């Protein structure tokens, strides 16, 4: 138990409490950060793109997520976001394929991480609409060309949101 607490040091209390239940609940898989590998070059961009979602908890199914929500409520441990494999799927969401051919674009964030095939729907859901660019000038040019409709992150972690905020 101590090892789990140390492993999730820096995570919210609710996340640690749920992960302490992992040995008793086969349907608890882990937090998003446990399920992806990222090359050093892309680490800052991916961390920025994920934001708080890096602590989301992946479960096998909705039943496990529901049980863990009840556990958190019963014990007043707080809230957590659960991503059941049986219901979360982000494949096919990105519509502006032409944007991926623009100068300075490295690809969609979900294509720049490694994960097991069974978790690809999760990474597509969380990262499949975020374009990664080399530099902020590339991101600004891209955002303007596509009328500020894209989610864009740079290698240094600058984030441009639809609507134009940076």
Model-derived features: positions:
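Hinge-like oligomerization/junction regions that interrupt long coiled-coil arms in large cytoskeletal
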Residues: 3-166
């Amino acid at each position: 138990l101590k090892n789990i607490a140390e492993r999730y040091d820096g995570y919210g209390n609710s996340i640690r409490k749920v992960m302490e239940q992992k040995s008793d609940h086969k349907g608890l898989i882990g937090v998003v950060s446990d399920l992806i590998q990222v090359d050093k070059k892309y680490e800052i961009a991916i961390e920025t793109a994920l934001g708080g979602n890096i602590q989301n908890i992946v479960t096998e199914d909705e039943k496990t997520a529901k049980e863990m929500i009840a556990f958190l409520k019963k014990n007043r441990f707080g809230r957590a976001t659960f991503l059941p494999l049986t219901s979360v799927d982000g494949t096919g969401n990105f519509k502006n394929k032409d944007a991926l051919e623009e100068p300075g674009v490295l690809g969609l964030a979900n294509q720049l991480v490694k994960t097991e095939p069974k978790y690809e729907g999760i990474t597509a859901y969380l990262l499949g609409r975020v374009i990664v660019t080399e530099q902020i000038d590339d991101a600004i040019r891209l955002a303007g060309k596509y009328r500020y409709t894209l989610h864009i992150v740079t290698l240094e972690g600058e984030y441009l949101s639809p609507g134009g905020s940076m």
